[in-house]
């Protein structure tokens, strides 16, 4: 997943990720967490809210930067999957 999200410094908002299964098979997300970092330094981390096939993360970046990374780790059945999103703060 190569997605990019923009924030204006001072914003506090939700990022929603939709998880899809290959071949539209039914599935359940059993757990999900995130890390929000810049150059390897973690600024925020926690659990995602799970709503059916959506993962909800609320972020409030502390500094302007073009290079934040949001990494989401979630579990479906017996597999662990990850998604990365680039976050720019202007």
Language-model features, listed with the residues they occupy:
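Contiguous segments within soluble domain cores/interaction surfaces
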Residues: 1-90
């Amino acid at each position: 997943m190569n997605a990019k999200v923009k924030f204006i410094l001072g914003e506090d908002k939700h990022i929603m990720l939709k998880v899809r299964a290959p071949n539209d098979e039914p599935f359940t997300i059993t757990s999900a967490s995130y890390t929000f970092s810049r150059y390897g330094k973690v600024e925020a981390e926690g659990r995602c809210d799970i709503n059916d096939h959506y993962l909800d993360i609320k972020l409030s970046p502390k500094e302007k930067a073009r290079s934040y990374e949001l990494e989401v780790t979630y579990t479906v059945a017996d597999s662990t999957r990850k998604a990365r999103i680039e976050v720019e703060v202007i």
